[in-house]
Amino acid sequence: MTSQLHKKGEAWSARFSEPMSELVKRYTSSVFFDKRLALVDIAGSLAHANMLAAQKIISADDLAAIERGMAQIKGEIERGEFEWQLDLEDVHLNIEARLTALIGDAGKRLHTGRSRNDQVATDIRLWLRGEIDRIGGLLNDLRGALIDLAEQNADTIMPGFTHLQVAQPVTFGHHLLAYVEMFTRDAERMRDCRTRVNRLPLGAAALAGTSYSIDRHAVAKTLGFDGICANSLDAVSDRDFAIEFTAASALVMTHVSRFSEELVLWMSPRVGFIDIADRFCTGSSIMPQKKNPDVPELARGKTGRVNGHLMALLTLMKGQPLAYNKDNQEDKEPLFDTVDTVADTLRIFAEMAAGITVKPDAMRAAALQGFSTATDLADYLVKRGLPFRDAHEAVAHAVKICDDRGIDLADLTLDEMKQELPNVAHLIGDDVFGYLTLEGSVASRNHPGGTAPDQVRAAVKAARAALAK
């Protein structure tokens, strides 16, 4: 009687009396997206094989054959010659089947002491660790581009906004450094997340560990992990590290989206603070004059995509009992797409930021509107002994008068200012007008974290030093 092993293609098929439905086969197969893990799968398998040989679980000849076969498979994959088969379900069984075809029984011994449960968990962690490092580098590129732009605009004055209303003058360099701070925290979160990603699940087997005398710490060292997952059930079943990475990525994209919103506003003709290089914009098929900031607009949209992946992964895990469940196959596509989206976005934003053209005159003209130095006038009165709330009320009255007349505070003569503010007239002198200039306003915020040009230059220096670490 022909054995089930010869009749069925699946590695687990001996237990079953009928072949898998073609519909189910397509529904459950993951090979056409998890093949992305092929090279880390090979790396994990080689580390596992070396440990098995060191522990005398397989022979030195078996190890040599496995290494030789894996080298050939790796080459086939890199050259695009490897034939992926739907019938073999996933990346792991495709590679194992090819290995066995190349080297015979030695290939069948590779899976000793291992399950696909701990194998895939190891693959994902290996792959994600490398992607975190890549994204960290891209965050640094964007930070560097923004730092350069901030340094060039340490003295460029623009309006600062609250509620999208003109609030106080700031320097454009100071404004850009706010985003540098955000992306710096993003980089810190990625590094912190990496510490929890960088634990080895291999050795947990299906869920309970293995009866073989394995050396998990040796495998961890070979693969560059900081240590091993301490509990076999947890090692194969949880994907909190993927959720944590996706949450950190959602914050990256949130910061990109905020920056994008401002770029779109700043580039609009009604604002005209900046121009984005043509290579990052598109036109209209009907309106010849259009130059559209499609890149930042699309980044805003892609932020929702990454947020959706975070919700998908959280929902994926919320109802799973221990240990591994097939639900976890659904972790990869959201994770892969999150990595692709974040990496592509950061790469293009670093290049786009370096090509921004700043329009200082437009920024200055906007800062002169909306009574942006009103707080400075209140501070002037406070420094002459008036309680702040009284100063606030007096200046608000002056703003109302100027608004009705269609002029700015700085347009009032000294006599007019005293006349309109009789209760504080004795506190107002010729020096008041120095407080009402844009330059005087920003220069007065001369403390760490302030918008004064000297502080911006100091912050640029500190940001560069942090980036170099």
UniProtKB/Swiss-Prot annotation:
It catalyses: 2-(N(omega)-L-arginino)succinate = fumarate + L-arginine. InterPro entries: Arg_succ_lyase_C (IPR029419), Argininosuccinate_lyase (IPR009049), Fumarase/histidase_N (IPR024083), Fumarate_lyase_CS (IPR020557), Fumarate_lyase_fam (IPR000362), Fumarate_lyase_N (IPR022761), L-Aspartase-like (IPR008948). Its EC number is 4.3.2.1. The gene is argH. It comes from the Bacteria. One of its GO terms (biological process) is L-arginine biosynthetic process. Signal peptide: none annotated. One of its GO terms (cellular component) is cytosol. The keyword Transport does not apply. It is found in: Cytoplasm. Pfam families: ASL_C2 (PF14698), Lyase_1 (PF00206). Belongs to the lyase 1 family. Argininosuccinate lyase subfamily. One of its GO terms (molecular function) is argininosuccinate lyase activity. This is Argininosuccinate lyase. Pathway: Amino-acid biosynthesis; L-arginine biosynthesis; L-arginine from L-ornithine and carbamoyl phosphate: step 3/3. It is an enzyme of class 4 (lyase). Keywords: Amino-acid biosynthesis, Arginine biosynthesis, Cytoplasm, Lyase.
